């Protein structure tokens, strides 16, 4: 990845596979999407949003908010893992039977 940050001044344009760059960009987009969904979901659930608390009174999270964020994050990743495993199993089963995409 040093070519992205100018670490290697050799002529890298010819040696960089555009398909790999496209896959890396797509992966970064997916990771960013997961992160944004996690932040939005857990913030909405855990950070008090009553009219009196729309402005953050404290610079840090309250203890209850912090615990909620920790639990929400753990649950989010656990569900994400289980969904990924289930989708992988479904894809493998469909591929084995030849019914993928039908």
UniProtKB/Swiss-Prot annotation:
Top-level taxon of origin: Eukaryota
Q: Where in the cell is it found?
A: Mitochondrion inner membrane
Instruction: Spell out the InterPro entries in the cross-references.
Output: Tim10-like, Tim10-like_dom_sf
Cite a single GO BP annotation: protein insertion into mitochondrial inner membrane
Main location class: mitochondrion
Q: Cite the Gene3D superfamilies for this sequence.
A: Mitochondrial import inner membrane translocase subunit tim13 like domains (1.10.287.810)
Q: Which Gene Ontology MF annotations are present?
A: metal ion binding
Q: Where is this motif: Twin CX3C motif?
A: 42-72
* Mode of membrane association: Peripheral membrane protein
Its keywords, alphabetically, are: Chaperone, Disulfide bond, Membrane, Metal-binding, Mitochondrion, Mitochondrion inner membrane, Protein transport, Translocation, Transport, Zinc
Q: Where are the disulfide bridges?
A: 42-72, 46-68
Output the Gene Ontology cellular-component terms: mitochondrial inner membrane
The similarity annotation says: Belongs to the small Tim family.
Q: What does this protein do?
A: Mitochondrial intermembrane chaperone that participates in the import and insertion of multi-pass transmembrane proteins into the mitochondrial inner membrane. Also required for the transfer of beta-barrel precursors from the TOM complex to the sorting and assembly machinery (SAM complex) of the outer membrane. Acts as a chaperone-like protein that protects the hydrophobic precursors from aggregation and guide them through the mitochondrial intermembrane space.
Q: Share the domain note from the entry.
A: The twin CX3C motif contains 4 conserved Cys residues that form 2 disulfide bonds in the mitochondrial intermembrane space. However, during the transit of TIM10 from cytoplasm into mitochondrion, the Cys residues probably coordinate zinc, thereby preventing folding and allowing its transfer across mitochondrial outer membrane.
Q: How does this protein assemble?
A: Heterohexamer; composed of 3 copies of TIM9 and 3 copies of TIM10, named soluble 70 kDa complex. Associates directly with the TIM22 complex, whose core is composed of TIM22 and TIM54. Interacts with the transmembrane regions of multi-pass transmembrane proteins in transit.
- The name on file for this protein is Mitochondrial import inner membrane translocase subunit TIM10
Highest classification ranks of the organism: Eukaryota, Fungi, Dikarya, Basidiomycota, Agaricomycotina
């Amino acid at each position: 990845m040093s070519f992205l940050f100018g670490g290697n001044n050799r002529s890298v344009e010819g040696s960089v596979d555009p398909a790999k760059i496209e896959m890396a960009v797509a992966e970064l987009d997916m990771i960013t999407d997961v992160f944004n969904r996690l932040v939005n979901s857990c913030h909405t659930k855990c950070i008090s949003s009553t009219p009196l608390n729309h402005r953050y009174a404290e610079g840090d999270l309250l203890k209850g908010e912090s615990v909620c964020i920790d639990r929400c994050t753990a649950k989010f990743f656990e569900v994400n893992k289980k969904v990924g495993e289930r989708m992988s199993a479904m894809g493998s089963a469909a591929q084995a039977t030849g019914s993928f995409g039908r």
